[in-house]
């Protein structure tokens, strides 16, 4: 993902939430420009720690998604934040998606748009959360 963003985006900063020590160490050792690596202890708050034992590893990652966005908006001087799944790869600039957003809107989220034959909405929900944009205006 990092390399594809670097190739297609003129200006980006990636905030990576490392969910284990090995991931944190490896990412920090790469010294990649435009990347801030955030450890789990830095990020986890009382609410997350309370639900952590009740979730599988995957469920906990999903649970943390909205909190990662809030963490960046609250702790860094940014006017917007885009949540991007770690396995996303860009073949072009994501600006085309952002250009569809009206200035008065604060959130960009898209539905899955499954074909009827492959509809998994009941299991995965209506919205695709691998790319969600938030303005820091509320």
What are these regions (language model features)?
Residues 1-138:
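Glycosyltransferase catalytic domains, chiefly GT-A lineage
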